[in-house]
């Protein structure tokens, strides 16, 4: 539902996943993918996907740095990108998320992925998108409230 970004249920949705959006839009997306696959239209897209390499990657020995990065990401998103925002705090969050992204990228490039590493990498990406969206919104609507826009 959140990924569909339809605005179907307005701005006051909090973090609920709309069953309607989840079912309808995922169904439409899957039918489109299947149809494109049958027609051979996915070749260009598949050709752009990076090749997976794992032969030369080592194992992630310890998860403590990932746990620390996850805690820092959670804290940043809660404190600086929560219900009440400001331009300064969004800039600060952007810098912190970029720093965490660099740390996670080092592990991603040097280690075979673990569930924890994949999840953290995905959370960093979502955090970047949320921060970018919050920075680009120049009016207070629904649950988006920026003190500098009052």
Where are these regions (language model features)?
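Glycine- and aromatic-enriched mobile tails/lids
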Residues: 3-150
């Amino acid at each position: 539902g959140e990924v569909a970004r339809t605005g179907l249920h307005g701005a006051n949705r909090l973090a609920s996943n709309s069953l309607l959006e989840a079912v309808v839009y995922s169904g439409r997306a899957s039918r489109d993918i299947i149809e494109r696959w049958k027609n051979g239209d996915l070749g260009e897209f598949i050709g752009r996907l990076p090749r997976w390499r794992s032969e030369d990657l080592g194992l992630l020995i310890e998860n403590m740095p990932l746990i620390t990065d996850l805690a820092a990401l959670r804290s940043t998103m809660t404190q600086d990108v929560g219900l009440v925002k400001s331009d300064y705090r969004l800039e600060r969050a952007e810098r912190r998320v970029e720093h965490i992204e660099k740390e996670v990228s080092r592990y991603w490039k040097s280690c075979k992925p673990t569930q924890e590493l994949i999840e953290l990498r995905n959370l960093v990406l979502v955090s970047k998108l949320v921060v970018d969206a919050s920075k680009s919104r120049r009016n207070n609507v629904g649950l988006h409230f920026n003190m500098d826009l009052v």
